[in-house]
Amino acid sequence: LFLTPFNSSTLPSGSLNSMAIVNDSGQPIYGVSTYAVFHDLKLHANGLLTYFDAWDRMWYAMDSNYVIVDSFWCGNGYFADMHDIQLLPNGHALLLACDTVRGVDIRQWIGNAPQQSNVIGVVVQEIDRNKNVIFNWRSLDSGGYKVSDMIEDPYGYLEADIDEIHANSLQLDADGNIILSARHLDEVTKLDRN
């Protein structure tokens, strides 16, 4: 079982955060506590473990001895997002990032929205072994904003940023294209990598 805290903001000031691996009896196999904020500790098919470090805004990969052997970050001025990383068989990595457009008038979709809102989209990147971006897709490049669950505003976010897409995961499909899960769209989107 791979464990990382999800919401460290509820911890008292000065608290340590942890990530751990425990066996099916609950006995710790690996653990570390630090002031850093960790997310999404997981094992990949190539045997590497990855986790997201929220302070560094990047992913780290560890070998079977829990030694950091690589790190992954987004290019083109974006910061990696904590929601997912996929390590591909060719040594490349798929990463998510957020992309904000400020000062957008979204009142045609949400009548009571502020005249100037910030719309948060998602960026999907594939980086090669040398950390070069070889694929870059922006949800906000579609030319218009999609109707999403955020438009219903169930949480009263109209005074804050509008998180149009909120991507949670990505995966390669059998055709080699990217499958993106978008929570606020209630959809799974297939992205052509060609």
Segments (PLM) and residue ranges:
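Histidine-/acidic-rich catalytic cores in large beta-rich domains
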Residues: 1-194
